[in-house]
Amino acid sequence: MSPQTETKASVGFKAGVKEYKLTYYTPDYEPHDHDILAAFRVTPQPGVPPEEAGAAVAAESSTGTWTTVWTDGLTSLDRYKGRCYHIEPVPGEENQFIAYVAYPLDLFEEGSVTNMFTSIVGNVFGFKALRALRLEDLRIPPAYTKTFQGPPHGIQVERDKLNKYGRPLLGCTIKPKLGLSAKNYGRAVYECLRGGLDFTKDDENVNSQPFMRWRDRFLFCAEALFKSQVETGEIKGHYLNATAGTCEEMIKRAVFARELGVPIVMHDYLTGGFTANTSLAHYCRDNGLLLHIHRAMHAVIDRQKNHGIHFRVLAKALRLSGGDHIHSGTVVGKLEGERDITLGFVDLLRDDFVEKDRSRGIYFTQPWVSLPGVIPVASGGIHVWHMPALTEIFGDDSVLQFGGGTLGHPWGNAPGAVANRVALEACVQARNEGRDLAREGNDIIRKAAKWSPELAAACEVWKEIKFEFQAMDTL
């Protein structure tokens, strides 16, 4: 055995197990502008020092393995290894730490969210030295961002396509989500759109089931939106869910939607996968289709605060992969969403440059260079009484999506749509007049209801509806 091999095998090892911190914990390292940076919430097993846990994350998500291998000598580990460069305790939590890891850009394939996630959130999440691990945030450097197309069109192009400015857009998910025939489904779409909504939506699990095949649904929905456009003089859209069992079938459905002349299609990006999503986003840009993204399955990944991936990371990944809309929570409805955290990743979706702000869960300053923005979609248990808060929280560049809050109107779908449109227009006008929506919101809705019987009926139906549960994810 050569002296060099003896040296390698005798430093930092005990009974064949490598101490990761000797190689991968580098507190003196200054991250480069072109590094991908990650903030992990680490919960080590009892007896494992935080430095060893952080170094283990850096190693197992980059070049490391549990023992030395002779092929280490054939490359430059110092160039390619991930580095845990800083560790800090999580305030108020016992035995939890934020470990900051820097990854050299050469570890990742250009333009591939799939490859980036395979490394950073791959096998390391099953590592025995950790009780739990959560990826809280990523810093994507401009050099890597520029390898992605991003959203097919972005916020401004969408507004120009729709010819709608100065207010949030209104949507509705058709219910019941499963069981309607294609013709009845199209009728529900028509009633909502003629009542004043901008969009209606396939639910995330509507694909091509025996009760309603995708081609029939596409045809009846296209008929509904074209008829409502003629009646209202406004451009309308329906999110036709192109998600399918194969990428080839998904693209076939998107092609048919384009041939029908509809403006937008939809994809379930987590269940469908990032590779499929990026492929569809490229098709949509090349063919003038907007792309609505649903985040079905996200809570499996992001709901537990000490294990998984925070949604702000999934939102960044979606902006890279491509989508013009994505569901983002409501803060006020039935689904999980704490206000400061939600607004943090809403800014990450829409803005060109977002400063580090730990009070909103943003661990890194994020420049997006020229990547278009994504419109956040607020949906889930919202109704007309929520309109002032939603208008204030999300602003104009958003979609406010009322499913039950439209279809549950006692007079039907079209009056439900009218109620939402009147409430929105009243809130936008009040905001433009300088009124405080947070303080005067209920009064604004009551006054608008005096000249809109549809809104008055909606206010009466949902006056007692609240979803008051403690948030799972808090700062």
Swiss-Prot record:
Top EC group: lyase
Entry binding sites for substrate: N123, T173, K177, R295, H327, S379
Residue ranges the record assigns to the propeptide: 1-2
Superkingdom, natural source: Eukaryota
Active site: K175, H294
Reaction catalyzed: 2 (2R)-3-phosphoglycerate + 2 H(+) = D-ribulose 1,5-bisphosphate + CO2 + H2O; D-ribulose 1,5-bisphosphate + O2 = 2-phosphoglycolate + (2R)-3-phosphoglycerate + 2 H(+)
N6,N6,N6-trimethyllysine found at: K14
Pfam families: RuBisCO_large, RuBisCO_large_N
UniProt cross-references to HAMAP family, sorted A to Z: RuBisCO_L_type1
UniProt subunit comment: Heterohexadecamer of 8 large chains and 8 small chains; disulfide-linked. The disulfide link is formed within the large subunit homodimers.
Name assigned to this protein: Ribulose bisphosphate carboxylase large chain
